[in-house]
């Protein structure tokens, strides 16, 4: 089992060197018009609502936009499965380019909590929402340079003295309903926070076996940690 160690929010400065070549190389676009972004964003929201249910009117906009180094915007989906779904809508560009493709293609990130949506800062919802925003942001930057697959595990480093966050991934396509943007098929990569001993179990036995245990115990696809581990140390 491959473990991915994410170094969050690292600025990488590169020098671009042009070489002559007889073969034409496709260069992804880096700039899009407001109209392109607006149309693409609406198609993306329409597509993700078909999987997660109608989104909440409120959006958690970052003070510093993700595309210039800030946090991701958080979108909330309280009308699907019990609780609230979280999703990113900024990883895939209007030209379809986004995270490095994995077995489900290019994708956005999703996660779930059993807590109902709440704006109270001392609520359990607010705490897990802020935690998941940090996880999504770290992963969002990392996926630009590395491939992440369903059933893999991951550790996200935290501040000095704090334990790493352990995660496992899965494709999220309930009842075979896939995420599309217009007529283009993409993917939703489910992020689930797990206990360290659960990650060790996945490393030794395979991620699918851990996912099966989480489903058997009724914890899938949620990231709430007010539960007991499904495996012993």
What kind of region is each of these model predictions?
Residues 3-7, 12, 16-88, 96-104, ...:
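Acidic, proline/glycine-rich low-complexity IDRs
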């Amino acid at each position: 089992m491959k473990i991915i160690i994410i170094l969050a929010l690292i600025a990488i400065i590169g020098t671009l060197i042009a070489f002559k070549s007889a073969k034409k190389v496709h260069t992804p676009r880096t700039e899009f018009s407001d109209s392109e972004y607006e149309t693409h964003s609406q198609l993306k929201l329409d597509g993700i609502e078909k999987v997660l249910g109608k989104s909440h009117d409120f959006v958690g906009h970052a003070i510093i936009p993700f595309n210039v180094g800030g946090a991701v915007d958080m979108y909330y989906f309280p009308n699907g499965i019990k609780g609230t779904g979280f999703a990113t809508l900024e990883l895939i560009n209007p030209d379809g380019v986004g995270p490095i493709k994995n077995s489900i293609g290019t994708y956005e990130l999703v996660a779930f909590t059993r807590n109902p949506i709440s704006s109270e800062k001392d609520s359990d919802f607010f705490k897990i929402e802020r935690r998941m925003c940090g996880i999504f942001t770290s992963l969002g930057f990392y996926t630009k340079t590395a491939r992440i697959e369903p059933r893999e595990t991951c550790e996200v480093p935290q501040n000095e003295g704090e334990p790493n966050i352990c995660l496992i991934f899965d494709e999220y396509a309930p009842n075979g309903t896939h995420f599309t943007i217009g007529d283009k098929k993409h993917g939703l990569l489910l992020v689930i926070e797990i206990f360290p001993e659960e990650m060790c179990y996945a490393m030794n036995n395979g991620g699918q076996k851990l996912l099966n245990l989480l489903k058997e115990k009724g914890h899938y696809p949620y990231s709430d940690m007010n539960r007991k581990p499904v495996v012993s140390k």
